[in-house]
């Protein structure tokens, strides 16, 4: 995803794919709920250095993080509508300077506009996690195959550029070292 600190961040997501310890969903009351883009998500840092973990550790309170990289205000609102059915005391919206641009792009998506126009609209995403996981795995496989094809093409192109097969046929090799007397 990103390597801003000299490493790729890795975390075990919760049951819905968010950057939380899964047991946070089992708590009867949530003190802080975070929503936002990659800053809320904890992109580029490992636990316990992401904002939700820091807040959890400093406050000693429950923190649920619904942030995700690339989200803008309308997706964040939809996320709250889909996943917020808990007793939450405080919602912290992590807003960043690129959010107005994200909002302009999101306003073109009919599915997201439904959340604004219809207060009862829901895709019931919490109940469709198996389907969501399958779609994500399918997308990952497609992208991995594209990377393999791309790298395979680069390798073949490099072999051609070095004229490996012609060199083999003509027995053109680097000269052997001269043995010492």
Q: Predicted regions span which residues?
A:
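A generic "cationic amphipathic patch" detector
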Residues: 45, 49-51, 68, 76, ...
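Conserved beta-strand elements of the Class I
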Residues: 31-35, 64, 91
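Catalytic metal-binding/acid-base residues of hydrolase active sites
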Residues: 39, 69, 97
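Membrane/wall-proximal cationic-aromatic binding patches
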Residues: 1-58, 78, 154, 159-181
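A conserved hydrophobic secondary-structure block that centers on an alpha-helix together
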Residues: 56, 62-73
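Interaction-surface signature
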Residues: 74-181
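Secondary-structure boundary/capping positions in well-ordered alpha/beta enzyme cores
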Residues: 61-62, 87
